[in-house]
Amino acid sequence: MSITLHLPTVLAKLADAQVLEAQGTTVGEAVAEVATRFPNLAPRLRASDGKPYPFVTFYLNDEDIRFQGGFDAPLSDGDELTVVPAIAGG
């Protein structure tokens, strides 16, 4: 499946683009495919074991993937996946 991946500005710098095309049948496959193409971005998207970080939220068509099966959430052609890293501070 071909999807669109939206990156926040802080991560877009690592891929030289804020919007990327990605391939995969699940969110995890699409994230892995992007991580392979952009090695500098990879450690910001997922842990070295391929699992999602608790402080990076992914939204599939504006819905939190944690309520859709996480990285196992299925994808359809044309889906939009948005990456939102947590912001700390005070």
Please state what every model-predicted region is.
Residues 1-89:
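Ubiquitin-like/PB1-type beta-grasp interaction modules and other compact soluble beta-rich domains
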